[in-house]
Amino acid sequence: MLKSFLIFLVRFYQKNISPAFPASCRYRPTCSTYMIEAIQKHGLKGVLMGIARILRCHPLAHGGNDPVPDHFSLRRNKTDISD
């Protein structure tokens, strides 16, 4: 139930708030999509993963492919950092 509500909040952001600003996420998937996938895969710990990802996403970040890892981690998924 809480997971569904958190995902609803992120989707609300994606549909109603995000379009008002230029795209700026340096990662794939985007930070909001990453948050949804992390919540689906890791439950409430996924929220922490999503927040850590948002904090990593800044103009000096290298960006690139950073999928949600299969195990809980607050660090970047380094399976494919060649992008």
From Swiss-Prot:
Q: Which Pfam families match?
A: YidD (PF01809)
Top-level taxon of the source organism: Bacteria
UniProt biased composition (Basic and acidic residues) = 68-83
Region of interest: Disordered? 63-83
**Major localization listed first in the record, in broad terms:** membrane
Q: Which SMART domains match?
A: Haemolytic (SM01234)
- Briefly, what is this protein's role? Could be involved in insertion of integral membrane proteins into the membrane.
**Protein's recorded name:** Putative membrane protein insertion efficiency factor
Q: Record the organism.
A: Streptococcus agalactiae serotype V (strain ATCC BAA-611 / 2603 V/R)
